[in-house]
């Protein structure tokens, strides 16, 4: 038995260059005033920003192989992008389209001309897709059974709380057919959608209903189950990088604010009690970075030991998710009264952190997964 390779947690020059490019675009096109304006409008997503990121920077096709029209990058590069998107709470469908839906499609038969063409359109930014599962779906939950397919590929059923479905033109739908599990391509126009009230207004959800919607079978049987599981594992592992970027922004912004704010005749950040809180938070964020980078590295090495992938993803989510929430809560509190206002962007980060906490498996769900390999009894 060979020992697992030591993970490379450092960023490469290519990853640093990618970060700089994404950060420059977000600084120019995704300021907090613009994000607040978006969520107050009828169209919370920013289509112009997405076109710039997806087509001009090629981010929509990061995970798509070059032979299918993508960039042929890995989960490590996608993780860097998600760090920056999380740090800006950018209202774009990268997680839903470029990660979840794309990874599910890559687990299907990419030699099929129609599937290859769809991946090419997604990679070019010409189309957007969403994986039709609840955002709370976690790796290892089993194949969903809320949608049924008949022998002709027509789908009937409902899926609630689907991320990035409102902006998608194509839905990748898990459904149970006459021969068992299957993944189906369905035009978004074939589904009735409603937008429920969601905590995170920068990533609105959709409730979808299918009534004999025409679908094309992408994968069936074990292939469909494996493709869905891989998509959820990849999504959960890379979500940790979004949460990391969010936590880093909260820490940096709070340090900056406390270094400027004066009270009682001195800079607020000079008080020892606040220094200790920020130092503790810094340690949490540094540890979260290690967990998120490890998950991205293991995912980038896929196919590797499935148990190693599951372990790295569960560890990242179990640790990083609470850190992101704590960082956002500390940012709100340490900003004082201004942190409670709508005009200050810190509430966007708290809402995203709380929404991400239940996305793709709660921390408790992932801790239970971690308990299995070390034979810990389940919590009472």
Question: What do these predicted regions represent?
Answer:
Residues 32, 115-116:
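Short amphipathic alpha-helical segments that mediate assembly, nucleic-acid/protein binding
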Residues 80, 84, 100-107, 117, ...:
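Generic beta-strand or strand-like secondary-structure segments
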Residues 1-86, 233-380:
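Alpha-helical interface subdomain recognition
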Residues 74-78, 98, 115:
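Amphipathic alpha-helical segments in well-structured domains
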Residues 92-112:
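N-terminal glycine-rich flavin-associated loop
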Residues 3, 116-248, 252:
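FAD-binding core of flavoproteins
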Residues 46, 111-115, 224:
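Amphipathic coiled-coil/heptad-repeat helices and related helical stalk/stem segments
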């Amino acid at each position: 038995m060979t020992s697992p390779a030591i993970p490379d947690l450092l960023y490469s020059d290519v990853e640093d260059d990618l970060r700089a490019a994404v950060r420059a675009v977000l600084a120019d096109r995704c300021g907090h005033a613009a994000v607040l304006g978006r969520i107050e409008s009828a169209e919370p997503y920013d289509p112009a920003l997405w076109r710039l990121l997806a087509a001009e920077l090629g981010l929509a096709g990061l995970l798509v192989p070059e032979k299918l029209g993508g960039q042929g990058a890995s989960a490590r590069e996608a993780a860097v992008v998600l760090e920056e998107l999380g740090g800006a709470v950018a209202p774009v469908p990268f997680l839903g389209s470029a990660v979840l839906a794309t990874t599910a499609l890559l687990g299907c038969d990419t030699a099929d001309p129609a599937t290859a063409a769809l991946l090419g359109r997604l990679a070019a930014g010409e189309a957007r897709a969403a994986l039709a599962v609840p955002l709370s779906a976690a790796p290892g939950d089993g194949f969903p059974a809320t949608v049924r397919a008949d022998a002709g590929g027509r789908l009937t059923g409902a899926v609630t709380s689907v991320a990035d479905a409102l902006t998608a033109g194509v839905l990748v739908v898990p459904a149970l057919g006459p021969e068992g599990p299957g993944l189906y391509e369905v035009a978004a126009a074939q589904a009735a959608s409603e937008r429920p009230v969601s905590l995170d207004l920068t990533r609105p959800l959709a409730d979808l209903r299918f009534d004999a919607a025409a679908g094309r079978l992408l994968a069936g049987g074990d292939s469909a189950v494996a493709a869905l599981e891989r998509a959820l594992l990849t999504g959960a592992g890379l979500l940790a990088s979004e949460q990391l970027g969010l936590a880093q922004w909260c820490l940096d912004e709070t340090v900056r604010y406390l270094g400027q704010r004066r009270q009682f005749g001195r800079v607020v950040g000079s008080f020892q009690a606040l220094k200790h809180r920020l130092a503790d938070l810094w340690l949490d964020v540094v540890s979260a970075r290690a967990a998120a980078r490890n998950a991205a590295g293991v995912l980038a090495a896929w196919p590797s030991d499935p148990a190693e992938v599951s372990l790295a993803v569960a560890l990242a989510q179990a640790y990083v998710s609470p850190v992101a929430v704590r960082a956002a809560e500390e940012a709100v509190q340490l900003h004082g009264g201004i942190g409670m206002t709508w005009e200050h962007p810190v509430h966007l980060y708290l809402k995203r952190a709380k929404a991400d906490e239940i996305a793709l498996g709660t921390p408790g769900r992932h801790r239970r997964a971690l308990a299995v390999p070390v034979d810990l009894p389940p919590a009472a």
